[in-house]
Amino acid sequence: MLCWGYWSLGQPGISTNLQGIVAEPQVCGFISDRSVKEVACGGNHSVFLLEDGEVYTCGLNTKGQLGHEREGNKPEQIGALADQHIVHVACGESHSLALSDRGQLFSWGAGSDGQLGLMTTEDSVAVPRLIQKLNQQTILQVSCGNWHCLALAADGQFFTWGKNSHGQLGLGKEFPSQASPQRVRSLEGIPLAQVAAGGAHSFALSLSGAVFGWGMNNAGQLGLSDEEDRESPCHVKLLRTQKVVYISCGEEHTAVLTKSGGVFTFGAGSCGQLGHDSMNDEVNPRRVLELMGSEVTQIACGRQHTLAFVPSSGLIYAFGCGARGQLGTGHTCNVKCPSPVKGYWAAHSGQLSATADRFKYHIVKQIFSGGDQTFVLCSKYENSSPAVDFRIMNQAHYTSLINDETIAAWKQKLSEHNNANTINGVVQILSSAACWNGSFLEKKIDEHFKTSPKIPGIDLNSTRVLFEKLMNSQHSVILEQILNSFESCLIPQLSSSPPDVEAMRIYLILPEFPLLQDSKYYITLTIPLAMAILRLDTNPSKVLDNWWSQVCPKYFKKLVNLYKDAVVYLLQGRKTFLIPVLFNSYITAALKLLEKLYKVNLKVKHVEYDAFYIPEISSLVDIQEDYLMWFLHQAGTKARPSVIQDAVTLCSYPFIFDAQAKTKMLQTDAELQMQVAVNGANLQNVFMLLTLEPLLARSPFLVLHVRRNNLVGDALRELSIHSDIDLKKPLKVIFDGEEAVDAGGVTKEFFLLLLKELLNPIYGMFTYYQDSKLLWFSDTESSRTFRLPWGRY
């Protein structure tokens, strides 16, 4: 292991070195015969994690940040952690964290701002203590700022604690510093890949490359195009399309690594730590042009300097503040552009010349930096191993995914230890929208990195395959847990305002769950899902509409049929509902979701319009009564308010009516309109009699006077002189010169004679189509013909 930079008590592991500044890489004599896994650097202390899980520390110990009583440059083991197998360590300015293989988190050091998460603000804690509030969580990843901490749990929950002077906890303005871990709800549902803390700012990275920043922004270190602090996570939109896979934070600057090996930096640049050949701050992410010809696989930020590793050449590039030797260039001056760290470096896959002294060369495995210090894990040329690639995400470190491997592991655990703790651990994952949202990413040509309001970025086929496997009887225990999780936790807790489009994939995933198609679960799964979708705010609701527009017709049709079946089920069982309000809310949810799907289908034509028809409507619902209720509601009548106000009328959703139901509805409408017209005429006649103006009385019938030898012309003439209201009245026909009273027979004869003339090919109004054997209006007719009064009748 090599190291360089500044140590107030001397370089770690070298007792004779009392000089604080080490300006070029030197071998760190610490535990030469044991393998170091990870190094974390604080303000003036260092933490070393060994492959066997032991933890060693050295440096200043003014606040107990070393976890033992000794102070100096010789690393000493933390005895209090000897019984734990530690897998990850992190440092703040004067405090430290250690994560065990069981997901438990320990803290020690300075605690005056609550940064230890121990529910106290003790000035110093010299012995590592378990953070009790996170004991029910399986923590996968931690990161420390100067005086605050971030932690990511297996179920996607994200916790912060410590100082909140600039909003770095992401909890909002109303929250002061926190002495115990607090859940950041504003990122719920997003499958997080990484959390990273700077001096007083914080970042979270999603599996699909969405970057969220908050906290101090005095130099633009959040990349949000301004210098205003943020108290809640904000999406760094300028990085959305860059496929970001890793983030490293300095005290007031930030560096991000993309999947293609590019590096973007932003924030404070007063020492050149952004690598843009200037000392200016940057409020927007800007690519480091000097590194564009190289594929970077590792980045690390110190307080005011930045490192980048290029495996093809084996070189480490450094830029920024060099006053304390932290760049490793052999000088103590600032550097504005990436410059190679001094030393003999070689690529793991490269070949050295025959004359080269192979024992001098180092092969980099991993770089670490923090404060004013840098450490490099490396090996000799002869027995080197490939360097760690930060672009390849380690599944053990990010939000848990639900796939064949995890299901097999759960099945084994439940068979061996079917206790409350095991079940709770499984339920936590299954109840997490974040875990589901990250589980079926479309990885073909990195499609999930394109996730947007128009592209969901998931592979629904893999979702379907997994659910089909779970329906196998051998997975009955897991299936039961999924069902319980969906019913009691996941669906009821879905947010009406998801923080990002990545949090919305769950709305496409859940309909693939086969038990939603089972009528036994309509009330507990299918209808609650519809309610959750309908609760969505305007913008996320539009996003879901866009995604539905993109799905395959088979998926869309299955969704339509699901809620058609739910409507039929509810109508068949409406009498069994003890509380009518519940029935009304359930069927309204199903109908409104169908309406939402219908509107989407109008734009994209996934299915034919008759796919929304529910043929059972005619037999399950009194169409005439339903239409009357709808009519009264539309008219705003005050009659029977308790019934009308809460009643659900299917006529509000005419797209579900087939021809039979629509015919009945139109007949009811015609009869109703006719009765309204007759009543109106009768009421006016009564008024005229009372005002002694009987001559102005109106007939309650529409009376047509026609001649048999000019039937069509007379009918059109008569219709043209009547108002729309008159046209809704019952019809009576009088043939000129005939004394017969029209009791219905004359009207029938009138229509028979009229249609006979209209359908005559010589007349030319209709055309007969041989293929369908149907009649329709002739193409030669102008649009004016269809607007004649006769057409309205």
Label each region the model flagged.
Residues 2-22, 49, 56, 60-74, ...:
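Short glycine/serine- and acidic-residue-enriched loop/turn motifs that recur at repeat junctions
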Residues 29-31, 79-81, 132-134, 175, ...:
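Surface loop/turn motifs at the tips and blade-to-blade linkers of beta-strand repeat domains
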Residues 40, 48, 79, 90, ...:
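Conserved beta-strand position repeated across blades of beta-propeller domains
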Residues 315, 321, 331-332, 339, ...:
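Blade-level signature of beta-propeller repeat domains, shared across WD40, Kelch, NHL, RCC1
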